[in-house]
Amino acid sequence: MRVILLGAPGAGKGTQAQFITEEFGIPQISTGDMLRAAVKAGSEMGLKAKAVMDAGQLVSDDIIIGLVKERLTQDDCANGALFDGFPRTIPQADALKDAGVEIDYVVEIDVADEEIVKRMSGRRVHEASGRTYHLVYNPPKVEGKDDVTGEDLVQRADDTEETVRLRLGVYHDQTAPLIGYYQDWLKADSATAPKFVKVNGIGDLNEIKQSLLASLKA
């Protein structure tokens, strides 16, 4: 089973990705990890990518697609793979399609922007230990203080409302159009298009997992 996972930053893709990979025994493939591994291994596509990166340029979609095809031939992908953060744009999705890389499911984890802002901007962290709290869902016993040490909690720069909204803006501009892309492909050609699954990412974690599992096994 080959799955593309879509959803805004903070929608809970990481949690669901881990669940899917464990449930179906497939690896999670991110383009960053794939690039690093190919460069380290000195594969043909890895050497091409290294030459581009060494020149300070962006790795082209053609090279990324080549790396994807190369990665899918490895033993751990025999049962499929989960694509994390790829494709990110319509041109990448087109390139994947044109290269004949078959995808079984596209899964969208659907969470409204305001819920994501609430989730992420409410996070507070004890930097020394990495303990994480949330002002609404998991507040510390004493406001602004770590439960164990009593030291101050901080809000990471990535979690400020301004930063979260900026990241959501990038997602809506670049990646959200993929949802329409795959839905339109399915309407036009259901024989070759991946099945599209939309999962509500708000609510009890186990219920979300069961809903996702039922859709992928349907």
Swiss-Prot record:
GO molecular function annotation: adenylate kinase activity; ATP binding
Matching InterPro entries: Adenyl_kin_sub, Adenylat/UMP-CMP_kin, Adenylat_kinase_CS, Adenylate_kinase_lid-dom, P-loop_NTPase
Primary localisation category: cytoplasm
Keyword Transferase: yes
Catalytic activity: AMP + ATP = 2 ADP
Entries under SUPFAM superfamilies matching the protein: P-loop containing nucleoside triphosphate hydrolases
Enzyme category, top tier: transferase
Start and end residues of each stretch annotated as LID: 122-159
Binding-site residues, ATP: 10-15, 123, 132-133, 203
Free-text function comment from the UniProt entry: Catalyzes the reversible transfer of the terminal phosphate group between ATP and AMP. Plays an important role in cellular energy homeostasis and in adenine nucleotide metabolism.
Quaternary structure (record): Monomer.
Protein name (Swiss-Prot/TrEMBL): Adenylate kinase
Species for this entry: Marinomonas sp. (strain MWYL1)
Organism placement in taxonomy: Bacteria, Pseudomonadati, Pseudomonadota, Gammaproteobacteria, Oceanospirillales
